[in-house]
Amino acid sequence: MMRDIHTKKIKKNAFRVTKARGFTASRVRVPGGHLPVKHMATIQKIAEEYGNGTVHLTARQGFEIPGIRYEDMDVVNTLLQPVIEGLDINQPEKGKGYSAAGTRNITACVGNRVCPFACYDTTTFAKRIEKEIFPHDLHFKVALTGCPNDCAKVRMHDFGIIGMTIPQFDASRCVNCGACTRVCKKKSIAALEQVNCRPKRNEEKCIGCGECVLNCPTAAWTRSKEKYYRLTLMGRTGKRNPRLGEDFVKWIDAKSIIKIIVNTYDYVDRYIDRGAPGGKEHIGYIVDRTGFEEFKKWALKDVSLSKNAEVAKTVYWSGIHYE
């Protein structure tokens, strides 16, 4: 039977056009990749009763439920409502599913609720960003990782957020065992050295990983109360020029990161190639075309950076060129 399917409309509603004729797949957003287990029952119900009985865990930490008939999209949207509300996802009209799919699900490592290496709660920050930028049709990818280990591979995204800390030293607790300097040399970048029987931190070299904090047996090193981040830019995969994101701002605060991302939507709306296939153009290619300085002007508009923030004077990307 022939069906009149508006492909752009169903894609915007977070359904995929699949290779199976007459069938689609529902894409479920999970900001920060953390899902209360009660919602698993809803996903299972949709998969078993309206899909093909399987669920795909996506690279962006969401769920994709394949094998859904086009005529069942409305009922699937209705069933997804408790999940959407439970995850506090912005939704202009209840019961209609997701209102956009351009801005991708924000991914994150498990963060400091579980991992001792993480410098902050990645899921909470991911949800905070989600509230500011979704729904939107522009193609943005944001990822968060708790520390410089970068388990979430954030340098492959448009915006990568890496947790940092400024280690605080209490000399009265130090027994000069040398554990911090040894671990910094072996596991990090040797930003500590022993001077007059005390560790001395090279502020220019330190990447804020917190290895010294984790390995000090007397808790002479502690994490800073303030949360800091490294913001990376315009990493990407793809056919033309895959590349890793480069540093934009070091020791930046959360509020400034959100403002920069929001500002970038205005920048993209101004410079995107309207004639690009599907009306989509990767942000990185727009920056390549306009130049970094123009992007920087838009990104930092009305941003009040903290005194510790270090903004890159310029950024150069390389990667692999297939053209």
List PLM regions with ranges.
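Short glycine-/aliphatic-rich beta-strand segments at the starts of folded cytosolic domains
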Residues: D4-H34, R104-G111, G245-D247
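C-terminal, charged low-complexity interaction regions
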Residues: G291-E323
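Small-residue-enriched alpha-helical segments and adjacent helix-cap loops
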Residues: S26-V175, A179, V183, E204-I207, ...
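A structural-propensity feature for long, helix-poor, extended segments
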Residues: I166, A179, K187, N196-P199, ...
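Flexible, glycine/charged-enriched surface loops at secondary-structure junctions
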Residues: N52-A59, N90-K94, H139-K141, A191, ...
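Short beta-strand elements
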Residues: F15-K19, F159-G163, Y229-G238
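A hydrophobic, small-residue-rich beta->alpha segment in the mid-to-C-terminal subdomain
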Residues: K227, G235-G275
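Iron-sulfur cluster-binding cysteine motifs and their immediate structural context
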Residues: A179-R201, E211-Y228
